[in-house]
Amino acid sequence: MGKRRLHQCSSLHGSVDATEDHACGTLKTPARRARENVTMGQRDAFTIERDALDGLFAALRERGYTVLGPTLHEQAIVYGEIGGCADLPAGWSDEQDGGHYRLLRRDDEALFAYNVGPHSWKRYQLPPELRLWRAKRGEDGRLTELREPPREAPRYAFVGARACELHALGILDHVLLGGAHAGGREASQRVRREDVFIVAVQCTQAGGTCFCASMGTGPTADSGYDLALTEVLEETRHYFTLDVGSERGAELVADLRHAPAAAEEQASARVARERAAAQMGRELDVSDIRELLYRNYEHPRWEQVAERCLACGNCTMVCPTCFCTSVEDVTDLQGEHVERHQRWDSCFTIDYSHIHGGPVRSSTRSRYRQWMTHKLATWIDQFGSSGCVGCGRCITWCPVGIDITEEARAIRDSEAAGTPAGER
């Protein structure tokens, strides 16, 4: 065993502890050790003070990333391009319930004390609108595809991704990066996704419609990130614990003013995360959920929910995993130019299932049943996992407050009570 000696290494970013390994003669900073530990499957934790957090945004921009994160816009917390801490929703939280969302002012300056809003990271994996190709009619009357020079894919850094959202990103990766659902565009999807730098934020409180604990997707993120922040507010101190999840995450930490996390700091962060798990607003019994829905395909509950459902598609638009799209061809009046666009669509629109002769699912009953059964049952057959991560967006942003957890519970309870599937 070589001797190790503690040093103080000064840099432009402040002083950090380092150790010298006499066996190999190298000086190891905590960030360098973290990079080596990630390679060996170990995780290191650091702390970063609130007033040093802007250094994180600066380091990401220096690496060529467009930084995306939470910001206030039109009375909601949404995702957009941010420059630093000044753009974060400092001092804001939210109140959520079925069909209800309201911002609340806090009595502190917490940066990440909100729950997930109407936006998800899906819009950067699967853009709401994407031009697939365009063509122009030549002098000979034939259409010629106009090929655009290859454009460098944007390098995104996602700041503020929650545990349920990391699972949603993984689910969409499985859908979009292979198989028939990729639509032959696996290469562009892979480029768009692989270079994303993810700074996760651990939930320290749960929203009124959250049920990620039931789905096993949160509230604590254990993987899928480069760095993970846990916000800790004390009477005289505001800081973050910083967990390293990748080699490039460890490399970025080296550019920040940081310190190894002490045991009491890690304990405070752990208590904050456990508080979120204890506050979960909803729960969903997923035992036998796939078979439960298959057994109750003709259950009267589908008709009952259809009487409330507006078939507006809000639930599918805010869902972080729904991937329905449609393709539309657009021409000019002279027929000289044509473009093909891919746009988000919803299985709640009557035209989505339209084939020759009419729509396959003409009733709201059949469309809601399709959505919920796909999300909780047939998705498992297709992709090997549930399509629901328990984020609760579909509950919050439903205009009439339809609750997927309540609908599943109603079917389960009626079956347990012995109510025949075809009777009210």
Predicted feature locations:
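Iron-sulfur-associated redox domains of electron-transfer enzymes in respiratory
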Residues: 38-294, 299-302, 322, 333
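Short hydrophobic alpha-helical segments enriched in small aliphatic residues
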Residues: 8, 14, 18, 23-25, ...
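Ferredoxin-type iron-sulfur electron-transfer modules in oxidoreductases and energy-metabolism complexes
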Residues: 286-307, 325-424
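Secreted/processed peptides and extracellular or luminal domains of membrane proteins
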Residues: 12-18, 30, 170, 218, ...
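Short, Lys/Arg-enriched N-terminal segments with co-localized hydrophobic residues
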Residues: 28-39
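Short cysteine clusters
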Residues: 6, 12, 164, 212, ...
